[in-house]
Amino acid sequence: LRSDFLLGPERYNKLIRPAVNKSQQVTIGIKVSLAQLISVNEREQIMTTNVWLTQEWTDYRLVWDPNEYEGIKKLRIPSQHIWLPDIVLYNNADGVYEVSFYCNAVVSNTGDIFWLPPAIYKSACAIEVRNFPFDQQNCTLKFRSWTYDRTELDLVLTSDFASRDDYTPSGEWDIVSLPGRKNEDPNDLTYLDITYDFVIKRKPLFYTINLIIPCVLITSLAILVFYLPSDCGEKVTLCMSVLLALTVFLLLISKIVPPTSLAVPLIGKYLMFTMVLVTFSIVTSVCVLNVHHRSPSTHYMPEWVKCVFLHKLPAFLLMRRPGRSNVRERFRRKHQRKSFSSHQDGDSFFLTDDPGRVCGAWRVGDLPEGSEFRQRVKVRHDQDVDEAIDGVRFIAEHMKIEDDDEGIIEDWKYVAMVIDRLFLWIFILVCVVGTLGLFVQPLFQSYNTPVAEEVYGDF
């Protein structure tokens, strides 16, 4: 039947399209069945798919009467022996336009031909990186005849959506919908193609675990910079370590997403946001260290600084400055009492023996008036006491100056602590608001926005 009747050279030529005359169109029914979504290369912007390209048409030359051939109604004929429509993938990315395997074609006695060749296509796909890794892509497969135009071949969709009956799920992508459409150009009557839209949504778990969560944890370490005491000397070191870690993650992102200037990926925006925050923390840490190590000999504390950073801001930030220690306060009160007593008893003197032991103490006024001993004691007393008082006053003034300087130094340290606490709350607020502002909307759209079945098909 096949060799003697159907495919005889006197009645069949596989190079001629099956049309009765040159003006007749040959209708080709096309349907795509997705077997596997192999990969989506974001950097090269290529989607690799394993599909079955169903093609159906009628060849009037391959008609026979089943009663004459023992009731045979179908034949499996090698596709190389019959005319085939030259349907190719127009938007391929590797130069392979045709199918991978030329399987047999199923020919019915009515001339209807069913051909289902498998193919692995690498198609160009414009990757939208704006919401990466919570993104949704729309990659297309565009099919059309390579040599026949619309006046010779009419391409029709046998189904509005690509089939997923034999689809193997992907570990990285979810299939949202696979709608197909027929495209015609009103300005070009010869143009015709069949386009399938592969609407796919990324599964973000891998990138959430390996990129987003580590970035958030590393950024949270920058918060500790403002809680770290200035005396430890590691504030800037911690900031630089965090900034270096974020730079490494930024280099990893640059190797994944395509090098496009049309949009910045979401994870890239977050990394840049955190790097700006960490850089800001470095600047503030340097300023805080500068304030912390100030002294009265180098800087003067203005009154507005005392008012704002020593009184108003600590109360607003719920900070309470500890008072002076009890030991130091008792020492100051004792020193004040002794100074007062020295002024009240300025005319008293002590008598000591040779080893320096105190034998007694008298006031000059207690001695008899006009006695020689009183005159000598008074002269000696005036000279020694004046020298002692001058020395004590010098020491007291020196201690008072040191105490005042130490108090001013403590005030500068407290100002630095208040600035640290202020920027700590600012950093936490900006970090939380910025993170939620960047991720909540794409995450909400990715998981909670339903896709209409009548528009996008089954999912």
Curated annotation (Swiss-Prot):
Membrane topology, as annotated: Multi-pass membrane protein
Sequence intervals crossing the membrane: 204-228, 236-254, 270-291, 422-440
InterPro entries found in the cross-reference section: Neur_chan_lig-bd, Neur_chan_lig-bd_sf, Neur_channel, Neuro-gated_channel_TM_sf, Neuro_actylchol_rec, Neurotrans-gated_channel_TM, Neurotransmitter_ion_chnl_CS, Nicotinic_acetylcholine_rcpt
Cysteine disulfide links: C125-C139
Activity control note: Activated by a myriad of ligands such as acetylcholine, cytisine, nicotine, choline and epibatidine. nAChR activity is inhibited by the antagonist alpha-conotoxins BuIA, PnIA, PnIC, GID and MII, small disulfide-constrained peptides from cone snails.
Any one GO cellular component localisation term in the record: acetylcholine-gated channel complex
Site feature: Key residue for a rapid dissociation (K(off)) from the conotoxin BuIA: V106, F114
Sites marked Key residue that may interfere with effective access of the conotoxin BuIA to the channel binding site: T54
PROSITE patterns (alphabetical): NEUROTR_ION_CHANNEL
CDD domains in UniProt: LGIC_ECD_nAChR_B2, LGIC_TM_nAChR
Annotated glycan sites: N21, N138
Keyword Transport carried by entry: yes
Subcellular location: Synaptic cell membrane; Cell membrane
GO biological process terms, semicolon-separated: acetylcholine receptor signaling pathway; behavioral response to nicotine; cognition; memory; nervous system process; response to hypoxia; signal transduction; synaptic transmission, cholinergic
Residue intervals on the Extracellular side: 1-203, 255-269
Catalytic reactions on record: Ca(2+)(in) = Ca(2+)(out); K(+)(in) = K(+)(out); Na(+)(in) = Na(+)(out)
One of the Pfam families matching this protein, by short name: Neur_chan_memb
Keywords assigned: Cell membrane, Disulfide bond, Glycoprotein, Ion channel, Ion transport, Ligand-gated ion channel, Membrane, Receptor, Synapse, Transmembrane, Transmembrane helix, Transport
Cytoplasmic side: 229-235, 292-421
Keyword Transmembrane set for record: yes
GO terms of molecular function: acetylcholine binding; acetylcholine receptor activity; acetylcholine-gated monoatomic cation-selective channel activity
Assembly, per entry: Neuronal AChR is a heteropentamer composed of two different types of subunits: alpha and beta. CHRNB2/Beta-2 subunit can be combined to CHRNA2/alpha-2, CHRNA3/alpha-3 or CHRNA4/alpha-4, CHRNA5/alpha-5, CHRNA6/alpha-6 and CHRNB3/beta-3 to give rise to functional receptors.
The protein's role, per its UniProt record: Component of neuronal acetylcholine receptors (nAChRs) that function as pentameric, ligand-gated cation channels with high calcium permeability among other activities. nAChRs are excitatory neurotrasnmitter receptors formed by a collection of nAChR subunits known to mediate synaptic transmission in the nervous system and the neuromuscular junction. Each nAchR subunit confers differential attributes to channel properties, including activation, deactivation and desensitization kinetics, pH sensitivity, cation permeability, and binding to allosteric modulators.
Family designation: Belongs to the ligand-gated ion channel (TC 1.A.9) family. Acetylcholine receptor (TC 1.A.9.1) subfamily. Beta-2/CHRNB2 sub-subfamily.
Protein name in the entry: Neuronal acetylcholine receptor subunit beta-2
